[in-house]
Amino acid sequence: MIKAAATLKSLQYRQNSLTDCYGRLSFGPVNPGQGLTIGNTLRRILLNDLPGIGVIGAEINGVQSEFSTLPGIRESVIEIFLNLRELIFTPTATCAQKVKQTKPFVYAKLNSELKIDNFPYVVTAKDLHIPEYEFVDPNQQIATILSPTAAENFKLTLLIGQGRGYQSWKKLPGVPQLMDQRFFEQFDSTQTNSKSVTFPIDAIFMPIRQVNFTVQEHSVDGEYIYFEVWTNGSINPFDAVKSAAKVGMKLMTACLTTLQDQQVYLDESKLPETPNFVQVNYNKMESESNFDQIFIEQLELSLRAYNCLKRANILTLADLSQQSFRDLMKLRNFGQKSADEVRAALSTYGIELKED
């Protein structure tokens, strides 16, 4: 049994470019046989479960097909969309918490004050106006404008969201409903001679590009795990491994709470006075409920129910749990069918509507 506490250490850090970071880390000592289990778990979490930010929809002035070409623009529409998928974001320090709590999606538009004097002009990430996020690489290319007429007509609107891994837009919470509602702003008729179409984009949210690990035995200390982590620059490798460990702890704590629920037949007189590990973590999870981070888009409600709640500023599961049946029935266009949908959705999270 290893008595020394395991620690995470950064052994090497290298930034090859703004969007390519490399880190080598060690974790240990751990007991013989545990290195492979811990290393494989953290590797899978790093590749699959860390959140990221990406472009999930785009609208270009006058474009009705992704196979179109734009007069005076070097790239085709498909090439522009592929460039948009490569944009990497990080929340600004002042807006990170606000965006996390209240804005599952945000807009980005081409800066209206952008003045182009020389052609060809390369439109880059820094030409977009988006106060909620920062670009990891402000010089990431989007499109090339070849003429003043093209510069005047080129209008771009993006929808940016958060997620994990690679996700089709059809599976992103709330996005299909937003597309059905024509969520994007339509440009003024004086700015366009034809109708614009909103194009969903399958986003790549993964901040981790690659992870390797090896386990080495030390005759005295036990096993050490050595990680090699490559990221896209939105997070450094050391913080990425720490975040992965937190995700793993949260998952395991959920398993422990299930075990705690199964101990109802124990003789309470024989339980220790000091709360055990399971009880402490169960109480902690109850007090740190994340219902305020679950948005109503994730409940997969009908469009009518979703719109009614959105108009009433009921944005999260926490907001919804504070409503009673009578409160919901007072909402405009909210009927019995919508109420039944909400009840069913809440039941999947183990909560009910507030008592009248």
From Swiss-Prot:
It is an enzyme of class 2 (transferase). Its EC number is 2.7.7.6. Keywords: Chloroplast, DNA-directed RNA polymerase, Nucleotidyltransferase, Plastid, Transcription, Transferase. It catalyses: RNA(n) + a ribonucleoside 5'-triphosphate = RNA(n+1) + diphosphate. Pfam families: RNA_pol_A_bac, RNA_pol_A_CTD, RNA_pol_L. Residues 277-356 are annotated as: Alpha C-terminal domain (alpha-CTD). It is found in: Plastid, Chloroplast. Signal peptide: none annotated. It comes from the Eukaryota. Residues 1-259 are annotated as: Alpha N-terminal domain (alpha-NTD). GO terms for cellular component: chloroplast; DNA-directed RNA polymerase complex; mitochondrion. GO terms for molecular function: DNA binding; DNA-directed RNA polymerase activity; protein dimerization activity. GO terms for biological process: DNA-templated transcription. DNA-dependent RNA polymerase catalyzes the transcription of DNA into RNA using the four ribonucleoside triphosphates as substrates. The N-terminal domain is essential for RNAP assembly and basal transcription, whereas the C-terminal domain is involved in interaction with transcriptional regulators and with upstream promoter elements. Belongs to the RNA polymerase alpha chain family. In plastids the minimal PEP RNA polymerase catalytic core is composed of four subunits: alpha, beta, beta', and beta''. When a (nuclear-encoded) sigma factor is associated with the core the holoenzyme is formed, which can initiate transcription. This is DNA-directed RNA polymerase subunit alpha. It comes from Ostreococcus tauri. The gene is rpoA.
